[in-house]
C-alpha cells in the first residue's frame, strides 16, 4: 500500500525537558520520525520546549516551535499551521497526555485533525489501569490482583484486600512518578497522597506485590495489515520491585525457556491487537513467577519508549523511524531494512548473535539525605549500554562505561570484617545503585550462593556469571603478569577484563599492561550490528569490539577521517547538550567531505544512531578503547572538546600516546582547567578575578582563607556540573570540605575564591580560530552568582546589563581566547558586582548553553567550531559580526527534587538540574513566563503568598512585596520578614514558625493556603521550617523561589501574556538574518 495522500501536514509533539523517567531517548525517536516523514514529502510541524534537542534544529521540520507542550499553546499553533494529523507517540508520556487534553477540549474535533500512530481509545485502554485489566481479561491474560482508587478513603478500604507489601502506581505518569512499595499503613498513606497529586486523572492502581518475580519486556511493531514483529526481548536482571529504568537489563533475554518466550511473544501480539495499536511500536512488560512459571502482564506503553531506544540500538532496527512510516499507511513488507539494504525488508524480525547489557547511571551524591534505595519510582539520570559476545564481556564493558570510578567489579568494602558482612547483606536485600558490586563482595566473602539468591532474588544464572568473574579476578591476582601467554591473556579479555582492571588486580600500571598486551600482538577485533547475525553482507559500519579472530571493521585508507569522542552516560552536569554538539560536529564534517567516526556508549542519544556518522563504535569512552580504534582507523584528527569532561580528562594521556587531537591543544585546556596556571594568564592580561588562592591541602587552605576572607567558594580542577564545588562560611565548613570531599581530587589543585555576594553572573559562548573571535551570545543569569550556571535561568540578550559592561565583556572574552590559543568553542563565566567585571572561569570546550544560543540566534555554533578545528577560518565561514536578536530567549532549568522527597531543594554552586526548556518572547517577561510554563511551574495570578527571607534579603524583598500587593496577592510573612514589610508600609499577616504557636507554617501549608512561596535561607544553616516549606511546596506543586533574583523574575512573568507571541524558529531566524 502506498503512503497516505489525504494527509499533507503532520504535527509532531516532542517530550519537553529531560527529566527522570523521560530523557533524551525521545529526541532520538522524534528526530527519526521527523526525518522519515519529511523524506516521504509531508510538511512537518514540530513542537518541543527543549532547545538542546536535535529534533528542534530548524532543518528537521518545516515549522519548528520551541514552545511549552501545553494544550493551550498547541491550540494556537494549530490555528496558525492547520495540520491534517497529529503524531503523539514520539514524545513520551508528555505528548500522550497533551493529545488527551486536546481531545478533551474539543480542539482536534473542531479543527478536523486525525491522530495517527495511536487512537484516543488505545491510549486510554493502555493508560487507564481498569480498562487495561478488563482488556487483558478479555484475551485470557492474567494481570496482578489490583484495585483502582480515586482518594485516600478508597485506598484504605482496598488495602486490607490486597495486603502488604503493596505496589502503588498512579495513572498517566512517567518513570513511576508518585508510586512506590508500601510495607505498612504509614508508607501506604504517604505514597497514595503523593500519587494522587501527581496523577493527571487522580487515579491510583493498588497492586498485589510481585516482588521477586522475574521481569521481561518485549518491543513489538505492528502495521495496518496486522503484520507484527518482535524487535527484541529484554530481561531485567533485577527482579520485580525495582523500576525497569533503574534495573540492569540484558538483551536478548537470557533465562527464558523457548516455550516461555513463545508464550510471551504470542501474548505481546495479542495485547497490541486488543489495545488497538494498529500502526507503530509498543512496549509490553511481563512478570514470571520463578517458582511455577506463572506469567502476568504488568503494563504496556502504546508508544515508543526508553526501552524502544535501547532495543533500536541493541538490534540496529530503527523502531521510531519504522513506527512513523507505519503511521502514514506504509506496511512492514514495503519498508526496507536500512542496515542490510535491498536484501531484506522491515518485516523480518532482527536476529542478534551478541549480548547487550544496560546499566543505569545514578546521581545520588548530588542530593544529600535522599533515599537512595531502588523501588518502583525511577531515580536514575542516565544509562550506558555495552555489547559483547557473552554476557560477562558486555557486563564488564558496561561497568567500564559508567564513569563512576570503577573498571569492573571493584570492591566496595575496604576491610572484610563481621561488620562488613552485615553491610553487604543489607545492601543485597535493600537494593541501592551499587548492589551489583556488593554481590561481588559477597562472593569474595564466601557468602553462599543460596543466601545471595535469597537476599537479592536475582536469577542464579546471573549470579553464577558474576561468581565466575570474581574467581578469575583471584586467578589474575596470583599470576606473574610478566610471564603471561597469549591465550591466557586473551581468555581474560574475552571475559571482559579491561587493561586497567587487570593492572589493578596485578598491582601494575595500565600502561605496563597495555605494553605487555601489545608485545603479545593481542588486539580486539570489531564486529558489526547488522540485524541478521551476519546472514547478509552490509555496508553499515555500526560496530563493537570483542576478542575473537575475524575483524569486520574493514577501515579504509581515507586520510580525511575525524574521530569524535562522545559524552558517555547522561548525568547531572553532562547531558544531552554535549551530545547535540557531537552530532553537529559529525554533520558539519560529513558535509565537508570528511569521514566521521563516533565513539560513544549511550543508547539514548542521537549520536549513537547508525546513520549520524560514517562509522559508529559503541564502546566505553576509556583510554584503552580509544587507542585501539585510533590504531586501526588512523584518523586525521580526534575531537575531544564536544563530549564534556569525559574525553577532556583523557587529553593528556591521548596526547602522550601520539593521538592527533585537533582544535584547542591539551596544553591550552590545562591552562584553563588548572586553576594555578589560569590565574597567571588572568594576571598577565590585567583582568580581575575574585581574590583567590590555589591550595593542595587543608593547612594551606586555612592560611589562605584568612587572607581571602569568608564566604569562600571552593572550586576543584577538572570537574563538570560544579561537582564538589561549595560555598563555605567559616573554618569549620572549610575543614569539613577538605576532610570529606577533597580526597577525590588529590591529583589537582583546589581554587579558593572570595564569594561575590549579590553579583550578576554572565555566560558567554564564543568561537576562536586563532586569529579572530566570534561572540556567539552574551547571557545574563537570573539567579545571582554562586548558583551554578547550569541551574540558573538565563536571558539572551541580557535584560539588565548596560552596553558599556557588555562591550567590556566582549573585549575580555577576545583577549582570553587569543591568550589561551583556543581553536574552536569556548565558554567564559563572569560575575558583575558594582560595575566591576570578575572572571569566574574559562572552559575551552563545548558548553551546555551551545544549543540554546544556537536556537536563539540562528547560528549553528558547534558546526562552525568543528570546521574551525579542521582549518576553516571564521572569515571563510562568514562569521564576523555577533548576532543580537530583537526578541528575547530565556533558558529555564528543570530540577528533579520531586523524585528525592526530603531533600532541601536549595540551589548552590553544585549543579542539580536534569534538563532545560526555552521560552521566546518579544520582551524578557513574556519569554520568562513561557519558559516557566514549559518547565511546568505552577504560577497563579492571585491568592496568598508566603514570604520568609534571610536578613540580608529583607531590604530587597520590600519592593517585590509591593508589586505582589499591587497585582492583588495577599501576603503572609514570618516574624522578621513581616516586621520589615510592616515597617515599610506593606500589610502582611504574621505566620508563626514551628514552636512559636498555633496555627504555624506547617498548619497553613497543610490547609493549602499558599499559591506561591518566597523563602531564602543562609546556606550554612539547616533550618527546620525551610525544610517543611520546601517539601510541602514540592508535594502540593506550589511555585517557590529560593533567591530574590528568582522571585523578581517570577513576579515579572506573572504579569505577562505568554500566548501573544508564538512563531516558528524558521520565521524567527529569517527575521534575525534580515535585521543583522
Curated annotation (Swiss-Prot):
SUPFAM superfamilies: Carbamoyl phosphate synthetase, large subunit connection domain, Glutathione synthetase ATP-binding domain-like, Methylglyoxal synthase-like, PreATP-grasp domain. Residues 133-328, 679-870 form the ATP-grasp domain. The keyword Repeat applies. One of its GO terms (molecular function) is ATP binding. Mn(2+) 2 binds at residues 299, 301. Mn(2+) 3 binds at residues 829, 841. ATP 2 binds at residues 715, 754, 756, 761, 786-789, 829, 841. Residues 937-1076 are annotated as: Allosteric domain. Mg(2+) 1 binds at residues 285, 299. Mg(2+) 2 binds at residues 299, 301. Residues 554-936 are annotated as: Carbamoyl phosphate synthetic domain. Mg(2+) 4 binds at residues 841, 843. One of its GO terms (cellular component) is cytoplasm. The large subunit is composed of 2 ATP-grasp domains that are involved in binding the 2 ATP molecules needed for carbamoyl phosphate synthesis. The N-terminal ATP-grasp domain (referred to as the carboxyphosphate synthetic component) catalyzes the ATP-dependent phosphorylation of hydrogencarbonate to carboxyphosphate and the subsequent nucleophilic attack by ammonia to form a carbamate intermediate. This is Carbamoyl phosphate synthase large chain.
Amino acid at each position: 500500500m502506498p503512503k497516505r495522500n489525504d494527509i499533507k501536514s503532520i504535527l509532531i509533539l516532542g517530550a519537553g525537558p529531560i527529566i527522570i523517567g523521560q530523557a533524551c531517548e525521545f529526541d532520538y525517536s522524534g528526530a527519526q520520525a521527523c526525518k522519515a516523514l519529511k523524506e516521504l514529502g509531508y510538511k512537518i510541524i514540530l513542537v518541543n520546549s527543549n532547545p538542546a534537542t536535535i529534533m528542534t534544529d530548524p532543518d528537521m521540520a518545516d515549522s519548528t516551535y520551541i514552545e511549552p507542550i501545553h494544550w493551550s499553546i498547541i491550540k494556537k499553533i494549530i490555528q496558525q499551521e492547520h495540520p491534517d494529523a497529529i503524531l503523539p507517540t514520539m514524545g513520551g508520556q508528555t505528548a500522550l497526555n497533551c493529545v488527551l487534553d486536546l481531545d478533551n477540549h474539543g480542539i482536534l474535533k473542531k479543527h478536523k485533525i486525525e491522530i495517527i500512530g495511536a487512537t484516543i481509545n488505545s491510549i486510554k485502554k493502555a493508560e487507564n489501569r481498569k480498562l487495561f485489566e478488563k482488556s487483558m481479561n478479555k484475551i485470557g491474560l492474567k494481570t496482578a490482583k489490583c484495585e483502582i482508587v480515586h482518594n485516600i478513603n478508597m485506598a484504605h478500604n482496598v488495602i486490607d484486600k490486597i495486603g502488604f507489601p503493596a505496589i502503588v502506581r498512579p495513572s498517566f505518569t512517567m518513570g513511576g512518578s508518585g508510586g512506590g512499595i508500601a510495607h505498612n499503613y504509614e508508607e501506604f498513606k504517604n505514597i497514595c497522597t503523593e500519587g494522587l497529586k501527581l496523577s493527571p486523572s487522580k487515579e491510583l492502581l493498588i497492586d498485589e506485590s510481585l516482588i521477586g518475580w522475574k521481569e521481561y519486556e518485549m518491543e513489538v511493531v505492528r502495521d495496518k495489515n496486522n503484520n507484527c514483529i518482535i524487535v527484541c526481548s529484554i530481561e531485567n536482571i533485577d527482579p520485580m520491585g525495582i523500576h525497569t529504568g533503574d534495573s540492569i537489563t540484558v538483551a536478548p533475554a537470557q533465562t527464558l525457556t523457548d516455550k516461555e518466550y513463545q508464550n510471551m511473544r504470542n501474548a505481546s501480539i495479542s495485547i497490541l491487537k486488543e489495545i488497538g495499536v494498529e500502526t507503530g511500536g509498543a512496549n509490553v512488560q511481563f512478570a514470571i513467577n520463578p517458582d511455577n512459571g506463572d506469567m502476568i502482564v504488568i503494563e504496556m506503553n502504546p508508544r515508543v519508549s526508553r526501552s524502544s531506544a535501547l532495543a533500536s540500538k541493541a538490534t540496529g532496527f530503527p523502531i521510531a523511524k519504522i513506527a512513523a512510516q507505519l503511521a502514514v499507511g506504509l506496511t512492514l513488507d514495503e519498508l526496507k531494512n536500512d542496515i542490510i539494504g535491498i536484501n531484506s525488508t522491515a518485516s523480518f524480525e532482527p536476529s542478534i548473535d551478541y549480548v547487550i547489557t544496560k546499566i543505569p547511571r545514578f546521581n545520588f551524591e548530588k542530593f544529600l539525605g535522599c533515599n537512595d534505595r531502588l523501588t518502583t519510582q525511577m531515580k536514575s539520570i542516565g544509562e550506558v549500554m555495552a555489547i559483547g559476545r557473552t554476557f560477562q564481556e558486555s557486563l564488564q564493558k558496561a561497568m567500564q562505561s559508567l564513569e563512576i570510578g570503577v573498571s569492573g567489579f571493584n570492591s566496595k568494602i575496604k576491610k572484610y570484617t563481621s561488620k562488613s558482612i552485615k553491610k553487604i547483606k543489607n545492601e543485597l536485600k535493600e537494593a541501592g545503585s551499587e548492589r551489583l558490586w556488593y554481590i561481588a563482595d559477597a562472593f569474595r566473602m564466601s557468602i553462599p550462593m543460596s543466601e545471595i539468591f535469597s537476599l537479592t532474588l536475582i536469577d542464579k544464572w546471573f549470579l553464577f556469571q558474576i561468581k565466575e568473574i570474581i574467581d578469575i579476578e583471584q586467578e589474575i591476582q596470583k599470576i606473574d603478569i610478566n610471564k603471561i601467554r597469549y591465550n591466557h591473556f586473551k581468555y581474560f579479555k574475552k571475559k571482559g577484563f579491561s587493561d586497567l582492571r587487570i593492572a589493578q588486580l596485578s598491582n601494575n600500571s595500565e600502561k605496563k599492561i597495555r605494553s605487555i598486551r601489545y608485545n603479545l600482538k593481542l588486539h580486539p577485533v570489531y564486529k558489526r550490528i547488522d540485524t541478521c547475525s551476519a546472514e547478509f553482507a552490509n555496508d553499515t559500519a555500526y560496530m563493537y569490539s570483542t576478542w575473537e579472530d575475524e575483524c569486520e571493521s574493514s577501515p579504509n585508507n581515507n586520510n580525511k577521517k575525524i574521530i569524535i569522542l562522545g559524552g558517555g552516560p547522561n548525568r547531572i552536569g553532562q547531558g544531552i547538550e554535549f551530545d547535540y554538539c557531537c552530532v553537529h560536529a559529525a554533520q558539519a564534517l560529513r558535509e565537508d567531505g570528511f569521514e566521521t567516526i563516533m565513539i560513544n556508549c549511550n543508547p539514548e542519544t542521537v549520536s549513537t544512531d547508525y546513520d549520524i556518522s560514517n562509522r559508529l563504535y559503541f564502546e566505553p569512552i576509556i583510554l584503552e578503547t580509544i587507542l585501539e580504534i585510533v590504531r586501526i582507523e588512523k584518523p586525521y584528527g580526534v575531537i575531544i572538546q564536544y563530549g564534556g569532561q569525559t574525553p577532556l580528562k583523557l587529553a593528556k594521556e591521548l596526547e602522550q600516546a601520539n593521538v592527533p587531537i585537533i582544535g584547542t591543544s591539551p596544553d591550552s585546556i590545562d591552562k584553563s582547567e588548572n586553576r594555578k596556571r589560569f590565574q597567571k594568564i588572568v594576571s598577565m592580561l590585567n583582568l580581575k578575578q575574585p581574590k583567590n588562592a590555589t591550595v593542595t591541602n587543608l593547612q594551606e587552605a586555612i592560611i589562605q582563607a584568612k587572607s581571602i576572607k569568608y564566604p569562600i567558594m571552593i572550586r576543584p580542577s577538572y570537574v563538570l556540573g560544579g561537582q564538589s564545588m561549595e560555598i563555605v562560611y567559616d573554618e569549620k565548613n572549610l575543614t569539613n570540605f577538605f576532610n570529606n570531599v577533597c580526597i577525590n581530587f588529590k591529583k589537582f589543585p583546589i581554587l579558593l575564591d572570595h564569594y561575590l555576594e549579590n553579583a550578576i553572573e554572565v555566560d558567554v559562548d564564543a568561537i576562536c580560530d586563532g586569529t579572530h573571535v566570534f561572540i556567539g551570545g552574551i547571557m545574563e543569569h537570573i539567579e545571582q552568582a554562586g548558583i551554578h550556571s547550569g541551574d540558573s535561568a538565563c536571558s539572551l540578550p541580557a535584560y539588565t546589563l548596560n552596553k558599556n559592561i557588555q562591550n567590556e565583556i566582549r573585549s575580555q572574552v577576545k583577549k582570553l581566547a587569543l591568550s589561551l590559543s583556543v581553536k574552536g568553542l569556548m565558554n567564559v563565566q563572569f560575575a558583575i558586582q558594582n560595575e566591576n567585571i570578575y572572571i569566574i572561569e574559562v572552559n575551552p570546550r563545548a558548553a551546555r548553553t551551545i544549543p540554546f544560543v544556537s536556537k536563539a540566534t540562528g547560528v549553528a555554533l558547534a558546526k562552525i567550531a568543528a570546521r574551525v578545528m579542521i582549518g576553516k577560518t571564521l572569515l571563510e565561514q562568514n562569521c564576523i559580526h555577533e548576532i543580537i536578536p530583537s526578541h528575547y530567549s530565556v533558558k529555564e532549568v528543570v530540577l528533579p527534587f520531586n523524585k528525592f522527597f526530603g531533600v532541601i531543594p536549595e540551589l548552590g554552586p553544585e549543579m542539580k538540574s536534569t534538563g532545560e526548556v526555552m521560552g521566546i518572547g518579544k520582551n524578557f517577561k513574556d519569554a520568562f513566563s513561557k519558559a516557566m510554563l514549559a518547565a511546568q511551574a505552577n504560577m497563579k495570578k492571585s491568592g496568598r503568598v508566603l514570604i520568609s527571607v534571610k536578613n540580608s534579603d529583607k531590604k530587597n524583598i520590600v519592593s517585590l512585596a509591593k508589586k505582589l500587593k499591587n497585582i492583588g496577592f495577599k501576603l503572609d510573612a514570618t516574624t522578621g520578614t513581616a516586621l520589615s514589610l510592616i515597617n515599610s508600609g506593606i500589610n502582611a499577616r504574621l505566620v508563626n514558625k514551628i514552636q512559636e504557636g498555633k496555627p504555624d507554617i506547617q498548619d497553613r501549608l497543610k490547609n493549602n493556603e499558599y499559591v506561591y512561596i518566597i523563602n531564602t535561607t543562609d546556606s550554612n544553616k539547616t533550618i527546620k521550617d525551610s525544610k517543611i516549606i520546601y517539601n510541602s511546596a514540592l508535594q502540593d506543586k506550589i511555585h517557590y523561589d529560593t533567591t530574590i533574583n528568582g522571585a523578581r523574575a517570577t513576579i515579572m512573568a506573572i504579569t505577562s501574556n505568554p500566548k501573544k507571541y508564538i512563531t516558528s524558529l524558521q520565521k524567527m531566524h529569517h527575521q534575525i538574518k534580515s535585521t543583522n
